[in-house]
Amino acid sequence: MFVRVMSREECQGVVAAGDLARLACCRDDQPYIVPITYAHSGNRLYCFSMPGQKIDWMRSNPKVSLQIAEFASNRQWKSVVVTGRYQELPATQGCHHERIHAWSLLEKKPNWWEPGGLKPVPQEISGASAHIFFCVEMDEMTGRAACAGEL
């Protein structure tokens, strides 16, 4: 097995084909990583969540990373790391079009709302919808691939 650097085009292919990422954010020198469903369009990754720790942390520090992988076996995989900036898409007239775009992309993914909409403990039901759409504007993308065989 050997590991090689992936081209930008290969990285873009992995990101475009995927729908599950590990989102990393940081606050007060403490990292936090969670799985999240995403949809890709242009230079943005669109996501959905309910309020909670990751949203609070990204609001205080919008610099984030996402890791997206294709895994065939322990000796054959691809991993892409995206760095970028969190941008919330509030339910305002100015963000209406982009929120609809995010929703239209995400709804094509099976169970897209579950990771962001379910919490490990019961939550109080409120009259207002607290869901949050956001995007990550991609700044940088790098990748590695493991291949069977020798160099």
Curated annotation (Swiss-Prot):
One of its GO terms (biological process) is nitrogen fixation. It comes from the Bacteria. It holds the Pfam family Pyridox_ox_2. Keywords: Nitrogen fixation, Plasmid. This is Uncharacterized protein RA0666. The lineage of its organism: Bacteria, Pseudomonadati, Pseudomonadota, Alphaproteobacteria, Hyphomicrobiales.
